[in-house]
């Protein structure tokens, strides 16, 4: 019993000590327990600072990126503006070059010899071998010398034999033409190599050359084996001068000749190598003026001059000319006085008061044996020498 009491007393003595010990241990434990929390708080604060700094850096990057983009856009605008300025400079340069070229052309002759305004320019198609044909024309319906000059000055009618040059520079053929021109002063020299199969090219070059030299209301092409009444031609054209685009002549539409050989010894004169472009065999050409003589107004001559490099040439010159006007607003005028026959046809018409513009024979595509017969045709079919001078233009 005594033993039990003693044991209880010892226990009571140790209670305060144990309490203090537990309190101390609790304090120590509590202090250690909050240290990590303090570290966590510091980490949270540090993390917050880092996030804030990252946000600032990010904002700075975004700002810099935006600034860079704005700078890039500004740069693009500046470069575009500079490019536009360059384009304007280029346009200005082209304009300057054009002006310089125009000025040079004026210096070369346009200023001192500007295009003369005339009523009509007639080009008589001729060849090196056709001296006698030219003389037969000069002796009949074409005025010579002072009369030819006066016709141009008073009536605005220009008449020239048109011819190119030979394949060999300064050949005997070219020198012969030089000599003939020095005598008669009635040639228009073309930058063209003469050849029968190059008539389409020659026609283009004639119109281009004539347009560059004369500002005419009408341009006419005629062959050197055709008889022409100049007064009737001028008065006929004058009736159409108010129309902007006219194509005047004897309109026809012949068959497209696909075969090149008649037999083993003869070829077809008017064979068309590009016959397939006109459709099936047996088709006809589109309507066009026969090539012996035709007239076109100023706008059409200018059109040929401007587009000369890209105008297609067919085998036949008159077909080529007609093809150049396909698709254009052109008035085709079929005037049968442009294709009268030789006597007695032209005489009958003259007696009836319907003087012919031109006379020739279809079988020869001109006046047959024109060198010998031009005078005969002129005596019978001529309108009279004074007709052209009395024509009101």
Curated annotation (Swiss-Prot):
UniProt record, GO biological process: protein glycosylation
InterPro entries given in the database record: DUF4094 (IPR025298), Glyco_trans_31 (IPR002659)
GO cellular component: Golgi apparatus; Golgi membrane
EC number(s) given by UniProt: 2.4.1.-
Region (Disordered): 89-112
Biased composition annotated in UniProt, kind: Low complexity: 93-103
GO molecular function, a single term: beta-1,3-galactosyltransferase activity
Pathway(s) annotated for this protein in UniProt: Protein modification; protein glycosylation
Top-rank lineage group of the source organism: Eukaryota
Membrane topology designation: Single-pass type II membrane protein
Main location: Golgi
Tissues of expression: Expressed in leaves, stems, flowers and siliques.
Transmembrane residue ranges: 9-29
Protein's job: Beta-1,3-galactosyltransferase that transfers galactose from UDP-galactose to substrates with a terminal glycosyl residue.
Compartments reported by the entry: Golgi apparatus membrane
Protein name: Beta-1,3-galactosyltransferase 7
Species in which this protein is naturally found: Arabidopsis thaliana
Key words, A-Z: Glycosyltransferase, Golgi apparatus, Manganese, Membrane, Signal-anchor, Transferase, Transmembrane, Transmembrane helix
């Amino acid at each position: 019993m005594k033993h039990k009491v003693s044991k209880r007393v010892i226990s009571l003595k140790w209670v305060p000590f144990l309490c203090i010990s537990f309190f101390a241990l609790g304090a120590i434990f509590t202090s250690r327990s909050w240290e990590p929390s303090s570290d966590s708080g510091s980490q949270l604060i540090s993390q917050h600072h880092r996030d804030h700094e990252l946000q600032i850096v990010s904002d700075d990057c975004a700002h810099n990126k935006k600034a860079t983009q704005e700078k890039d856009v500004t740069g693009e605008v500046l470069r575009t503006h500079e490019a536009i300025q360059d384009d304007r400079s280029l346009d200005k340069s082209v304009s300057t070059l054009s002006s310089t070229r125009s000025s040079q052309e004026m210096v070369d002759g346009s200023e001192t010899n500007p295009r003369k305004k005339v009523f009509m320019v007639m080009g008589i198609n001729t060849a090196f071998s056709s001296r006698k044909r030219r003389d037969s024309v000069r002796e009949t319906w074409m005025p010579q010398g002072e009369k030819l000059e006066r016709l141009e000055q008073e009536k605005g009618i220009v008449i020239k034999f048109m011819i190119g040059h030979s394949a060999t520079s300064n050949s005997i053929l070219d020198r012969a033409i030089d000599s003939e021109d020095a005598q008669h002063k009635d040639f228009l020299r073309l930058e063209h190599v003469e050849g029968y199969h190059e008539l389409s090219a020659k026609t283009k070059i004639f119109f281009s050359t004539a347009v560059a030299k004369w500002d005419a209301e009408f341009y006419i092409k005629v062959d050197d084996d055709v008889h022409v009444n100049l007064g009737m031609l001028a008065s006929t054209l004058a009736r159409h001068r108010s129309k902007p685009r006219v194509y005047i002549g004897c309109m026809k539409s012949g068959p497209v000749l696909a075969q090149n050989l008649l037999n083993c010894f003869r070829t077809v004169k008017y064979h068309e190598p590009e016959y397939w472009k006109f459709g099936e065999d047996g088709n006809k050409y589109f309507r066009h003026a026969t090539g012996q003589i035709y007239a076109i107004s100023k706008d059409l001559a200018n059109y040929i001059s401007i587009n000369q490099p890209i105008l297609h040439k067919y085998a036949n010159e008159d077909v080529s000319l007609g093809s150049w006007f396909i698709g254009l607003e052109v008035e085709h005028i079929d005037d049968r006085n442009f294709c009268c026959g030789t006597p007695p046809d032209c005489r009958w018409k003259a007696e009836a008061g319907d003087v012919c513009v031109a006379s020739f024979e279809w079988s020869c595509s001109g006046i047959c044996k024109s060198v010998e017969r031009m005078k005969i045709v002129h005596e019978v079919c001529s309108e009279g020498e004074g007709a052209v001078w009395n024509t009101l233009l």
